[in-house]
Amino acid sequence: MNAVYLDNNATTRVDPAAVSAMLPFFTEQFGNASSMHAFGAEVGGALHTARRQLQALLGAEFDHEIVYTAGGTESDNTAILSALETQAGRNEIVTSAVEHPAVLALCAWLEKTRGTRVHYIGVDARGRLDIDAYRRALSPRTAIASIMWANNETGTIFPVETLAAVAHEAGALFHTDAVQAVGKIPMNLRHSEIDMLSLSGHKLHAPKGIGALYVRRGVRLRPLIRGGHQERGRRAGTENVPGIIGLGVAAELARHHIDEENTRVRALRDRLEQGLLERIGNAWVTGDTENRLPNTANVAFEFIEGEAILLLMNKAGIAASSGSACTSGSLEPSHVLRAMHVPYTAAHGAIRFSFSRENTDADVDRVLDVMPGIIAKLREMSPFWDGAAAAKSGFAPTYA
């Protein structure tokens, strides 16, 4: 039995082409790019090529608008903390209630330790941002608005260009966590109002431990990590050369295949959703089904726990993720689904299936074969499930 991996929003397999490109930089071209000798110059040239590859994927105007980091979390932290330092007289942040913890945890820390005021903008039942509330929250005191490009759990896409323009009307900077969007949504940042953008290599078939922060030319950036002069003095530390090379190759592959792969992956995702809803009652798709990432399906199965579903899926050789998280011994639904007002009976049983270019029709077939039995087995054990009553109820979620 072949394993089925449908957790690509968590991480992706490194593309073999990226691995091949990286290998020489471990044992042959191992110089420090800051060194004056030939070993350093050789590495420096390779880094320049990789930077241009990422620039092309982002549609950035200048390659020096890219600052390499260790990943999305560092990029998010750098952008927000820098804005608070460079935007004189401004000490407020506007963000959404459904951001990644890389943003939300930082905001909570800033509230507690620095007295920063943070406005958390809500979403509707489909995960769409309340634009009017966003506009009202912005003021001359706002240093930065940070809104993700696409949600990691539901795939819902946010209108970041509109949000950036509105932020600028208030004199604030605009940052977007685009970790889930880069490589899945075509970008043209040279014609964008986005000031800063975070990305992470391991979400697009590059290695873990490498990411980047796009900083639009003219936007001041205070480094989070201080030391040497690397990245034009904006991020100290010897460059992760193999990681940067791998990210460059992955970016090049994504740019060349984004349209065809989006079409193919969307078809797989849609077939999975349709098949699950046809085979399993009291289940539905969460998020904005008309405006979301092509690879992401978040399906809520009512009256059972996501953790239990995942355990049985894992035994069947299928990897996905749950909308629930176990924290300090108490099971709580995802903060994203709570913000969307998904009923607890469904939010606890939400499963995210996230595809990549490596997935096939056979993967979908396997999930459709296995999932009905898993859900039926768990519902039989659930004290909240009355199959006969549910079948007669004609249940449909009123919040969708």
From Swiss-Prot:
Gene Ontology biological-process annotations: amino acid metabolic process; nitrogen fixation
Top enzyme category: transferase
Active-site annotation: 326
Binding positions (pyridoxal 5'-phosphate): 72-73, 152, 180, 200-202, 238
One Gene Ontology molecular-function label: pyridoxal phosphate binding
Positions carrying N6-(pyridoxal phosphate)lysine: 203
Gene3D superfamilies given in the database record: 1.10.260.50, Aspartate Aminotransferase, domain 1, Type I PLP-dependent aspartate aminotransferase-like (Major domain)
EC numbers, comma separated: 2.8.1.7
Cofactor: pyridoxal 5'-phosphate
Database matches in SUPFAM superfamilies: PLP-dependent transferases
Binding site for [2Fe-2S] cluster: 326
Keyword vocabulary terms for this entry: Iron, Iron-sulfur, Metal-binding, Nitrogen fixation, Pyridoxal phosphate, Transferase
Domain of life of the native organism: Bacteria
Keyword 4Fe-4S on entry: no
Oligomeric form and interacting partners: Homodimer.
The family this protein is said to belong to: Belongs to the class-V pyridoxal-phosphate-dependent aminotransferase family. NifS/IscS subfamily.
PANTHER family listed in its UniProt record: CYSTEINE DESULFURASE, CYSTEINE DESULFURYLASE FAMILY MEMBER
Purpose: Catalyzes the removal of elemental sulfur atoms from cysteine to produce alanine. Seems to participate in the biosynthesis of the nitrogenase metalloclusters by providing the inorganic sulfur required for the Fe-S core formation.
Record's protein name: Cysteine desulfurase
Species name: Gluconacetobacter diazotrophicus (strain ATCC 49037 / DSM 5601 / CCUG 37298 / CIP 103539 / LMG 7603 / PAl5)
